[in-house]
Amino acid sequence: MPIAGTKYAPFPAPQLDDRTWPSKRIEKAPIWCSVDLRDGNQALIDPMGHDRKERMFRLLIDMGFPEIEIGFPSASQTDFDFCRWAIEQGDVPDDVDLQVLVQCRPELITRTFEALEGAKTPIIHFYNSTSELQRRVVFAKDVGGIKQIATDAAKMIMDMAAKAGGGYRFQYSPESFTGTELDVALEICNAVIEIVKPTPDNKLIVNLPSTVEMNTPNVYADQIEWMCRNLDNRESLIISLHPHNDRGTGIAATELGLMAGADRGEGTLFGNGERTGNVDVVTLALNMYTQGIDPGLDCTDINRMKEVYEYSNQLKIAERHPYVGELVYTAFSGSHQDAINKGMKARRSANSPVWEVPYLPIDPQDVGRSYEAIIRINSQSGKGGIAYILQADYGLNLPRNLQVEFREIIQHITDEEGKELPSKRIYEEFQKLYVTQPDARIKFVDHHTYPHPEQKGRRILTAEITDNGVTKTIEGKGTGPIDGFVDALSKYLGVKMSVVDYSEHSLQQGSDASAISYVEMVYPGGKLFGVGINDNIVSASLEAVVSAANRVIAK
């Protein structure tokens, strides 16, 4: 690459030493305006036809956008026709205002009014570029010439609106605001304000776009705060943000801009738009939601939002895209999985409605996702993740030491295969190793106990087993069935074994629920677990002993 300092220069930043926005907090959602059907659409390789537009339009209405920019009706017949359809057949709710975009050119303004005939309180969004660079290299005009473009358009629009009987709302954008000197942007905006003559009951939207993101988000916030302080008739204005994402900080720029005094935000679903995209309204809304702020948009079916986005835009959403990507609610890291597992358990036992789960800033169910994909298993996963999957999907509450033991088994498989293991495969491996044991030598069949004739408190156990398919009867002594059965198997197999830990729980609710037992067995070579599942809790325990014994003799 060329030397940075010889090819590029930093963009100037305003001097605002008494800025107040850093101490502010976002306490309510802004007025949202979707520009998917205009800014988003113009950036597509294949712009939307009517069907794709209508599907996006319906979603935006269902989500609750109060303002929707539906196109640039003077720029193409397709946009003009869609504008007419939305007004005549779109069933637009009374609390939704349609917005259209138009350049400050007389013939385009005239066509725009034709497109809006019959609309309820439509917003006419007129704009012209004001940046120093475009004044110099695109328009070859001074500030006065650029201001006249804006004021001539404002006069024409106000005149045509009055002749049409009123009912219109107005929005002005000094396009490329972030590349415009603040005093120039202020001069042009104030000239437009003087012509429109907004009131507190009929406000003018002054949109201050970061058409190209040129600086850090704090600079944009300084620019917004400075404009909010200095614009004429501030109480009759709605200050709007329209950030792009060229530097990857569109979300932060919008949030800081709201802290700096803006009232409104324009953007697109998941950030579609020219170059690196417009700001992502969904991420903004859900960021607010996770801070306890009503976002003003309904994002409860994020899967539908994703499906419509991909159909209408013919674009794919990245797997790591905030809140919507396939992997954003998934942890592979062992320590993360363990923390999530413990957090979910703590939540189930807590009385508080407040969501507090490590590594999950939002409850996936709030946006229509399930808990199934929270934890997925690969070579980086730990015992907590595996335990969570077996508990969440199959109702197994593994003792901690069994979690550690089984994690080593799964770790070996994932290392060997080099890929993720799905939940079903993990359960199958658990069943094969501990429960069904298809290649096991010993199988439990039945048992009986009766009091020891000479030792009070002890019992004699006789058990029927099969050894490689051959039926055998074995006998042992102990304080109960498990103790006696371990004694019988130890003598029969010639291996000293004893139980050091035992636990059990039901697998379903109700009187006919199956029981699962976990037995940790110590033997001369170490310790390992066995697991048994049976409708009878005692039989489940003895099957767990056999499970452990089979693993001992297989060593």
Curated annotation (Swiss-Prot):
PROSITE patterns: AIPM_HOMOCIT_SYNTH_1 (PS00815), AIPM_HOMOCIT_SYNTH_2 (PS00816), PYR_CT (PS50991). Pathway: Amino-acid biosynthesis; L-leucine biosynthesis; L-leucine from 3-methyl-2-oxobutanoate: step 1/4. It catalyses: 3-methyl-2-oxobutanoate + acetyl-CoA + H2O = (2S)-2-isopropylmalate + CoA + H(+). One of its GO terms (biological process) is L-leucine biosynthetic process. Residues 30-303 form the Pyruvate carboxyltransferase domain. GO terms for cellular component: cytoplasm. GO terms for molecular function: 2-isopropylmalate synthase activity; acetyl-CoA C-acetyltransferase activity; magnesium ion binding. SMART domains: LeuA_dimer (SM00917). It is found in: Cytoplasm. Its cofactor is Mg(2+). Belongs to the alpha-IPM synthase/homocitrate synthase family. LeuA type 2 subfamily. Catalyzes the condensation of the acetyl group of acetyl-CoA with 3-methyl-2-oxobutanoate (2-ketoisovalerate) to form 3-carboxy-3-hydroxy-4-methylpentanoate (2-isopropylmalate). NCBIfam families: leuA_yeast (TIGR00970), PRK03739.1 (NF002991). Homodimer. This is 2-isopropylmalate synthase. It comes from Brucella melitensis biotype 1 (strain ATCC 23456 / CCUG 17765 / NCTC 10094 / 16M).
